[in-house]
Amino acid sequence: MTRPDTLFSALPRVPLATLPTPIHDAVRLRRALGGDRRCPRILFKRDDLTGLALGGNKARKLEFLIADACRREATSVVTTGAVQSNHARMTAAAARAVGLGVTLVLTTREPAPPKQGNYLLDRLFGATIHLIAAGPDPRIAVAPDEEQRVSEVVEEMTRRGERPYVIPVGGSSGVGALGYAAGTLEIVEQLKELNLKPSRLYYASGSRGTQAGLELGARLFMPPYRLCGVAVSGGEDEKRVRAARIANEAAALVRAQVTITAEELVTDQQHIGEGYGISTREGLQAIRLVAEQEGILLDPVYTAKAMAALLADVRAGDASPDETIIFLHTGGVPALFAHAGSFQ
C-alpha cells in the first residue's frame, strides 16, 4: 500500500506556499457566541497565511499547476476570473516567482474598474490584462464569452512565438485539485498531533476546485470531519458535474482507485445573496465579528459567506457545544479594500 506521505512525491511541484499553515483555536469567538455551553469549539485552518502574494488557498493549487507549466516548457500562463479575483492575483505572483509571463482575462461590470485590491496587485506583478464584460446574471461568476476570449488570447500569443499554459478559472482542474488533496493530508496529520476529532469542516466554494481536492482528500485520508461547502455563486448543477470530473481527474493522477459522483457533491446554497462578488449583510456582520474577536480578517466574497453559514448553524443549534468544527480560511483579504464602501 502506498504511504500517504509519498502519494504526491512523484508529481511535479513548485514550493510556493509556506506550509503547514497553522490551526488557530478561536476561543474569543466561541465565547462571543455563548461559550462552551452553547457553541462548539471553533478552529481556523489558516490558509490565508500561505504567504504567496498576501496568502490564500490558491497557493496550494498553484504549486502543482505552475510545476506542470514548467514541465511543459511554457513561457507564460493564462488564466481568467473576475476583476477582483484572488486566483488571478496569486497566479500572477506564482508565475513571476518562477520567471514566467502572465496574461489575465478578467470580467468586470465597470468599463474602467478602480485600481485597488487584487486588480492593483495584478498590475504590480506586470500582468498583461484583457477586460471583458461580465454576464447578465450576477449569480454566475463566469462570463458567456470568457472561454472564447481566452482561446483568442492564446492564439495571439502562440502566433507571437510564445508557449502559453492555460490555467482554468480558480485553478480548478485535476492538477490543481491535487493541492487540497495534499492539504487534507496536512490537516489530518495536524489533527492527529493535536488529538482532535472535529465533526465538520466549513469552506467557501466557487469554481469547485477546492471542493474537488477536499473530497478526494477525504476519500484518500479519511479525516474525522464531514465537509460543509458553502456556495458563493450560482450554477450548482453544472458545478457539481465539474467538481466530480476534476476530482476524478486528480484521483487518476495519483493512481487512486476512487470514483466521485456529482450527486455526492452538495453545497449550501443559502448564502450566495444577490450574486457572486456582492457582499451580504450576514457576511459583513461575520467579518466584523471575527475581526473584533480574533483579529482575523475575512473577505466579503468568499470567507464571509462561509462564516455566515457556520454562524447560522451555531445559532440555530445545529452544531452541538460538544462538537469541534473547523473553518477553512481560504484568504482573499485584498478584496476588503475593493469593498470598502460596504463598511461605511
Stretch-by-stretch model annotation:
Residues 1-344:
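PLP-dependent amino-acid enzyme catalytic core
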